[in-house]
């Protein structure tokens, strides 16, 4: 049972016998014409019009024939000037919304009507057909696909099988990529691509990198998890799951300026559906205290997209009147989550205001029945009269994103008084720590969990390794970490500029951490360490405050230049050709590398930095204007750092980019800021994203804080 044919056969049999699909073997049995096996006129057709027209008639009865024919023509039509991904996005939206046709009724009146293509409410009403070994003619080449899954005649599933001895990447490289080039019109409609070899199996988007294909190991969140073909097929191709995934768990995100097709991972599908079941219980009166639960999916596992899936499915399936208030406690996190929602097409602040700029503006937005409102919890800074709430509707859901530090106290009390009928759900990438009863008190128990270990096992994230370099260099401040971390958290919650307060209130502790000789040692070690790890990816350095960021930047800049000069001197002594080539590439990489300080703006910052002999303006210019590209255009620091091939490789930060900022090519995080447990876990997880060729992330701990995690 190891041949490719047997794997195909087992797959088709599972779809037919266990999941209720029809199954057809087309290789040498298909004929052509209206009454043929599949009703295709020729091998170039990828829409099975026989089944499509049957369902159009069934779902939209008693229309003239011209209406059905017009719908089929629109579904078949492909704009050759578009990219394949743009066409796929267009066809996906057409499936969700239906196809609009015009026809004249018996009275000669022009009627416009939207025809339903798929039944999303009763999945079993759709026609599911698996076709093995289907011949498809491209512009030049004739290709034979292993298995194509049609729903109502539309090719939504592509499955490529290999024998037991072949790696799944061969199915991706040798077949999927080839078919995208040679028979692209098949993928204009594709929802899911599955790769199988009888044991291993992965699902992804046809336009995604292989690294973004993922297993489907569980049918329920409580399952231990097993990688096998049957679990994948039952999890994805069960009729209810397939239609649910198609309708609610596929999105197109252009938040980075480049459109990406996102398919929910196994844990997102299961977790979001559990969260939605919690909302259903709340609506039915089964939850009396408005606590919808805590959604804990470890950092790097797609929590922001899970929020998008959650809100979008609720508005589509439970009612379009719901309002979601996405509440964070940091301006940069608020911006990042807004751009994820906007990039996914759910909202647009430029067209319709949805981002609260003040308490008064927040009150105004809440009175306008918006779909989405984005706010900092600090905007709830006014005491609320319980008899005069901002809005008493019971179809408002508050999503608290990583707000462990601010979900209690005055601001949270104001929030709950302002929206007494709202439901509350907490999304977090870090577990509730042992003494975190406050979180449970406000949100309830876990509604879904996906921990660090599972994420690594599922390859949703890479493992993180730890290097206690602070101890090796004797610059760790082990006994001071907790005290400093507590003070930093206190000041950041108050949303104040922390340098002066830290210096004044911590005094000796602050001076120890920011002592010139300590920063010198740290900068030297960073340059030595990162310059020898130059092939691994990008680096982020986390400092205690803005002043220290700029001080460290200046030191790194100096030692980086010295290191380049030393390597050039050493190059002259090298006699081995391979080593010489390696060193030349290292020098070129170092010379091209850009370093930037990324910190938030504050009033009077020029004078403040000048008092310390520092210049913030050169860094502020980069933050505001970004970097110039070869074509003269400019790219923002955020997008430059996210692009693996852009030479902005070293980001020095103190608070920005520590949460909700995904950079798959970030491989090493250099930590020199004492942080409390939740924030610390969020920060170190910056390095756990999956990327091509990346096997792990590395946390270099200079201050010694990770010992106590």
Question: What do the predicted segments below correspond to?
Answer:
Residues 503-653:
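Conserved C-terminal RecA-like helicase domain
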Residues 177-181, 406-423, 687:
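Short, conserved "post-DEAD/DEAH" coupling segment immediately C-terminal to helicase motif II
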Residues 226-229, 437-538, 552-574:
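Interdomain helical connector at the RecA1-RecA2 junction of SF1/SF2 helicase-like NTPases
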Residues 2-323, 332, 336-348, 368-372, ...:
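ATP-dependent helicase/translocase motor core
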Residues 370-414, 633-638, 653-655:
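Conserved RecA-like ASCE ATPase "motif II neighborhood" in helicase/translocase motors
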Residues 298-299, 402-405, 418-435, 459:
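Conserved helicase ATPase motor motifs in RecA-like P-loop NTPase domains
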Residues 680, 686-709:
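Conserved segment of the helicase C-terminal RecA-like domain
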Residues 652-653, 657-674, 680-682, 697-701:
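A short beta-strand element within the Helicase C-terminal
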């Amino acid at each position: 049972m190891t041949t490719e044919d047997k794997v195909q056969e087992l797959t088709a049999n599972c779809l037919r016998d266990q999941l209720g699909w029809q199954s057809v073997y087309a290789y040498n049995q298909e004929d052509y014409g209206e009454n043929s096996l599949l009703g295709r006129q020729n091998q170039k057709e990828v829409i099975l019009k026989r089944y499509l027209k049957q369902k159009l008639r069934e779902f939209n009865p008693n229309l003239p024939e011209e209406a059905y024919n017009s719908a089929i023509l629109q579904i078949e039509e492909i704009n050759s000037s578009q990219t394949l991904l743009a066409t796929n996005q267009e066809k996906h939206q057409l499936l969700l919304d239906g196809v609009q046709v015009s026809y004249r009724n018996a009275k000669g009146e022009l009627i416009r009507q939207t025809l339903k293509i798929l039944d999303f409410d009763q999945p079993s009403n759709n026609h599911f057909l698996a076709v093995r070994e289907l011949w498809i003619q491209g512009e030049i080449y004739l290709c034979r696909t292993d298995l194509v899954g049609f729903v109502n005649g539309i090719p939504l599933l592509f499955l490529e099988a290999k024998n037991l001895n072949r790696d799944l990447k061969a199915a991706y490289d040798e077949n999927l990529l080839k078919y995208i080039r040679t028979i692209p019109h098949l993928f204009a409609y594709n929802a899911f691509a599955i790769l199988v070899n009888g044991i291993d199996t992965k699902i992804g988007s046809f336009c995604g990198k292989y690294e973004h294909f993922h297993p489907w190991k569980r049918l329920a969140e409580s399952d231990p998890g097993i990688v096998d073909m049957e679990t994948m097929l039952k999890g994805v191709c069960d009729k209810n799951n397939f239609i649910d995934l198609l309708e609610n768990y596929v999105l197109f995100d252009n938040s980075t300026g480049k459109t990406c097709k996102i398919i929910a991972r196994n844990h997102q599908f299961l977790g979001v559906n559990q969260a939605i079941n919690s909302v259903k219980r709340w609506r039915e009166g089964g939850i009396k205290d408005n606590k919808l639960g805590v959604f804990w999916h470890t950092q790097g596992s797609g929590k922001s997209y899970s929020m998008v899936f959650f809100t979008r499915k609720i508005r589509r399936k439970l009612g379009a009147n719901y309002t979601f208030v996405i509440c964070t406690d940091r301006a940069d996190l608020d911006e990042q989550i807004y751009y994820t929602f906007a990039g996914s097409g759910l909202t647009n602040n430029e067209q319709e205001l949805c981002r609260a700029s003040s308490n008064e503006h927040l009150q105004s937005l809440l009175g306008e029945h918006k779909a989405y409102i984005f706010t900092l919890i600090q905007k709830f800074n006014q005491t609320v009269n319980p008899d005069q709430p901002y809005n008493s509707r019971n179809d408002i859901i508050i999503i608290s994103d990583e707000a462990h530090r601010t979900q209690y106290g005055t601001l949270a009390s104001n929030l709950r008084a302002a929206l007494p009928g709202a439901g509350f759900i907490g999304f977090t990438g870090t577990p509730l720590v042992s003494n975190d009863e406050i979180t449970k008190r406000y949100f309830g128990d876990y509604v879904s969990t996906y921990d660090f270990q599972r994420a690594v096992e599922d390859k949703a994230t890479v493992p993180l390794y730890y290097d206690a370099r602070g101890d090796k260099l004797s610059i760790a401040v082990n006994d001071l970490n907790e005290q400093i971390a507590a003070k930093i958290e206190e000041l950041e919650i108050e949303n104040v500029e922390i340098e002066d307060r830290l210096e004044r209130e911590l005094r000796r502790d602050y001076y120890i951490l920011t002592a010139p000789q300590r920063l010198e040692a740290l900068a030297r070690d960073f340059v030595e360490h990162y310059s020898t790890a130059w092939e691994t990816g990008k680096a982020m350095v986390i400092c205690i405050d803005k002043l220290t960021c700029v001080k460290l930047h200046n030191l790194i800049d100096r030692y980086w230049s010295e290191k380049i000069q030393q390597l050039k001197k050493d190059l002259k002594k090298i006699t081995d050709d391979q080593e010489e080539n390696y060193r030349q590439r290292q020098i070129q990489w170092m010379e091209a590398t850009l370093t930037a300080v990324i910190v938030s703006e504050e009033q009077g910052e020029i004078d403040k930095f000048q008092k310390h002999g520092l210049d913030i303006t050169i860094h502020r210019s980069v933050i505001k204007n970004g970097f110039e590209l070869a074509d003269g255009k400019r790219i923002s620091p955020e997008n430059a750092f996210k692009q693996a091939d852009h030479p902005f490789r070293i980001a020095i930060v103190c608070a920005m980019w520590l949460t909700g900022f995904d950079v798959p090519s970030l491989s090493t995080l250099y930590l020199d800021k004492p942080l409390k447990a939740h924030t610390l876990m969020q920060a170190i997880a910056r390095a756990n994203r999956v990327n091509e060729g990346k096997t792990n992330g590395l946390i270099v701990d200079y201050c010694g804080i990770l010992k106590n995690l």
